[in-house]
Amino acid sequence: MKTKLLSIFAALTLVACATPVTQTEIQQAKLPPAPKQADIDKEVNTYLKSALNTPDMPTKECAPARKAWARALAFETPKFGWMVVCDIKAKERSGGDSAMKTYMFLFTTNGNYTYDAASFSNINNNVQFLDLIK
């Protein structure tokens, strides 16, 4: 019982440690050029082939790229780049549709990163579009 309580306390403490991204960090961010549509399609399709059981026939809708920051864990240093958000509905092996899932693809100067929106307990601690920050 003590172990469970300590684990819960530790998890809550880490969540409370979410440090906000500062205006200074945003102003000093080095962004790559906006990705071309061909680069976006290549990255999304490569991810789908590795992540889905039947990557041949997914339905996908992707929003245009926007400047953003993201981090997998709320206390990590944010990565700045261009974010593309895609809603993907894969086909089941039986032929039926699976549930729609949202994935985020971040194009940075240090490579590309993929995030599953469902994995964030509070998405505002993990992702933010720069045009929404005042």
Predicted regions and their residues:
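Cystatin/cathelin-like cysteine-protease inhibitor module
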Residues: 18-134
